[in-house]
Amino acid sequence: MIDNNCLYKEELNRNSYSGLAKEASESILLPSESGFDGSRSPVCSSPDPNLNYRPVIGILSHPGDGASGRLTNDTSSTYIAASYVKFAEAGGARVIPLIYNEPEEVLFQKLELVNGVIFTGGWAKKYDYFEIVKKIFTKALERNDAGEHFPVYGICLGFELMSIIISQNRDILERFDAEDNASSLQFVDNVNNDGTLFQRFPPELLKKLSTDCLVMQKHKYGITPANFQANPALSSFFEILTTCIDENSKTYVSTVKAKRYPITGFQWHPEKNAFEWGSSAIPHSEDAIQVTQHAASYLVSEARKSLNRPESQKVLSNLIYNYKPTYCGYAGRGYDEVYIFTQPRSRF
């Protein structure tokens, strides 16, 4: 016996499918039916003339070989950890190495080729290195004061040196126990993230930054919020965005943004999550990688606002591509790759 209810349901299903198919066919148009001329290329919007789509970041080298002398005994050698180069490239920029001990005339000619600067991590706080950082930092302020948008990232040692320069106090730093651990970031109450590197972070990632260990700490020194605020020069120049707590539950300033300049200071390492593997403490989760990516994108988005567009050939002749990185990760600690500079190869 035929079940009339089943026949009715089958007919209803056929009619529903037919209706959906008809609706789909009416909404999907072939190129010839849409008025689009397939023989012509689509019209793209014009680039913003106020942005530089070929930004170059200068990264200052640091004394040594980056591997405690395992790679070279040349006392004049300097290095840049490749993770900083990859960090800038991940944001969409090219890199020119600023070799700190080459003739100042050459160094500052190179500085005229870039749209922003990174002061890296390391240990050198005195003598020639400090003086070069101070001169480059002063130049960066002058360029911004003259109307050019010129961003600076000071990471770990870079932030420490900027703090010493601004405060004019070498004793502003104190010891902390944060030499090899991941941590969260504690955002200052009522802080405004507009115009900071955190502005483009998705809300969920910002929330995780304050609860999960997504940033890498690798430093012995820092500044307490109290000492920071007690120094008029420092507190008027920078705004504190985040703090961190070290292994002894001692609080230090971890992220700052200059109030009048596109300058950001980190007492953590945004570059390590994606590009360093020597320490098991470095976070490599998807969220941690996004932290690196957003920090890199912010730096380069600021560099695009620089309208400094030097002669192309001079840029090409001084790019990091003219050098080869050295793999030094066999020891299972420290950097994975470094660029070592023993003889300047600048071309002007």
Curated annotation (Swiss-Prot):
<keyword id="KW-0378">Hydrolase</keyword>
<feature type="signal peptide">
    <location>
        <begin position="1"/>
        <end position="23"/>
    </location>
</feature>
<keyword id="KW-0732">Signal</keyword>
<protein>
    <recommendedName>
        <fullName>Gamma-glutamyl hydrolase 1</fullName>
        <ecNumber>3.4.19.9</ecNumber>
    </recommendedName>
</protein>
<dbReference type="Pfam" id="PF07722">
    <property type="entry name" value="Peptidase_C26"/>
</dbReference>
<feature type="domain" description="Gamma-glutamyl hydrolase">
    <location>
        <begin position="46"/>
        <end position="342"/>
    </location>
</feature>
<dbReference type="GO" id="GO:0046900">
    <property type="term" value="P:tetrahydrofolylpolyglutamate metabolic process"/>
</dbReference>
<feature type="active site">
    <location>
        <position position="269"/>
    </location>
</feature>
<dbReference type="GO" id="GO:0034722">
    <property type="term" value="F:gamma-glutamyl-peptidase activity"/>
</dbReference>
<keyword id="KW-0134">Cell wall</keyword>
<feature type="active site" description="Nucleophile">
    <location>
        <position position="156"/>
    </location>
</feature>
<dbReference type="InterPro" id="IPR015527">
    <property type="entry name" value="Pept_C26_g-glut_hydrolase"/>
</dbReference>
<keyword id="KW-0926">Vacuole</keyword>
<comment type="function">
    <text>Cleaves the polyglutamate sidechains of folate polyglutamates in the vacuole. Is important for polyglutamyl tail length determination before vacuolar exit. Plays a role in folate stability and intracellular folate content.</text>
</comment>
<dbReference type="GO" id="GO:0005773">
    <property type="term" value="C:vacuole"/>
</dbReference>
<comment type="similarity">
    <text>Belongs to the peptidase C26 family.</text>
</comment>
<dbReference type="InterPro" id="IPR011697">
    <property type="entry name" value="Peptidase_C26"/>
</dbReference>
<keyword id="KW-0964">Secreted</keyword>
<dbReference type="GO" id="GO:0008242">
    <property type="term" value="F:omega peptidase activity"/>
</dbReference>
<dbReference type="GO" id="GO:0005576">
    <property type="term" value="C:extracellular region"/>
</dbReference>
<dbReference type="InterPro" id="IPR029062">
    <property type="entry name" value="Class_I_gatase-like"/>
</dbReference>
